[in-house]
Every structure is written in C-alpha cells, then in structure tokens.
Amino acid sequence: MVERVAAICDMQTELPLARVITILRYTDHLKAAGASVDRLLCRAGIPAVLLDHPEAAVPLPTAFRFGELSCQALGTEHLGLHVGLATSLDGLGPYGDVLKGCVTLYDYLRKGISLYNMLITGQHLWLSDHGESYG
C-alpha cells in the first residue's frame, strides 16, 4: 500500500494555465467592437485587474470560457480569426520580435510552438515528420 501511495504522489499532474497576455488581444478587439469586457471577464471568472499583469496566469478552461462568451457577445464563431488578422507581429511585443527573426516557415512554426508552450501549460504543440511533409 505504501508503494502505491508513493507512486501516486510521484505522478505529476499539470494544471493547464494560460498567461493573461494571451487574452489581451481579445480584450482589445472586444473593446473596439463595443462589448463589455469587464462583464465578460466577470462571467468567465477572470478578475479584470489581471489585465494589468500580462504574465499572470489563469486556468486554461477559464480562458476558453472567456473566449466562448466573447464569441457569443459578438455573434461570431470566428473571433480568433478576426483577432489574428488584426494583430501584427509588432503587436505581440517580444514574442513578435522573436518570430520576425525567422527566415523560413519551418523556423517560424518551431519558434511559434516553443513560445506557445511557454505561454500555455498543460497543452503542448509539436511538429512531427511525415515523409516530406510536417503535420
């Protein structure tokens, strides 16, 4: 029994988290569209004061909930697409600076995934080799 308890204690469980910086572009877009950002944050369970702390973390399901509520508020399922199209690499701060230094698409994707894995925990992206293509 002691061995079983020790094995359970040794298992690492990773709490999926997202840095607040990942939702800031969404809040900017929502404000520009006239949506009540504070209300949406409150409904999702994200204290509005966290927007002043981009390196703070929120549970990933809470960030997803904010995204869902935001889509409903704007009447679109494509909010991420709209935000992505409206955001330049310059708008991503130091993360964008790293990506701007990429020479090839492959390098851009590898660095982008590396940065993503730094901003989001409990969820991982990677590239895998499938012959002459990557998936």
PLM features per residue range, with description:
Residues 1-134:
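N-terminal low-complexity or simple alpha-helical regulatory segments
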